[in-house]
Amino acid sequence: MVKKNNLKNLGFAFPVGSPHVSRTMMLAELGILLEFVADPQAPQKDYIHAVVQDNCLGKRTAKNRLISKRYLVELYSLDPNLALFRALLFFWQRDQGGHPLLALLCVYARDTLLRASAKYILPLTEGSLVTRESMELFLDN
């Protein structure tokens, strides 16, 4: 069995909470940010600066910029020192049509709630109704 510490070193995360409680995968924001910070060697601080100082996402308030920064870091790490983010950048530049799937794979590795709910969601057909109660019941068991 692979230890959590080894996975964390690659960029996987095991948080108690989840950005998915109040946010989506922020796919559009990720795309804007990765276009704004075009250097694949850029350190994490450059991504954070782009969101918070440069307001590349066009947020109306400083608080919204900080919230967006926090969720983007939780979802994607934005840290080229981690293999997961480096892989995201590598494939992002090579497959524009694959952006949604690449983002999903990265978030799946970093978001506990998404991983926990995948077994419930994946067998459903597109357009199926998922109620809060049914999801809570699944997650509680």
Task: Show where each model-derived region lies.
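Hydrophobic/aromatic-lined pockets within catalytic cores
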Residues: 38, 122, 140
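Amphipathic alpha-helical segments within well-ordered protein domains
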Residues: 34, 118-122, 136
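Eukaryotic partner-binding/assembly regions in large regulatory complexes
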Residues: 2-109, 130
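DNA-recognition alpha helix
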Residues: 131-141
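Short helix-capping/hinge SLiMs at alpha-helix to coil transitions
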Residues: 123-127
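A eukaryotic nuclear recognition-module signature that targets compact all-alpha binding cores
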Residues: 108-121
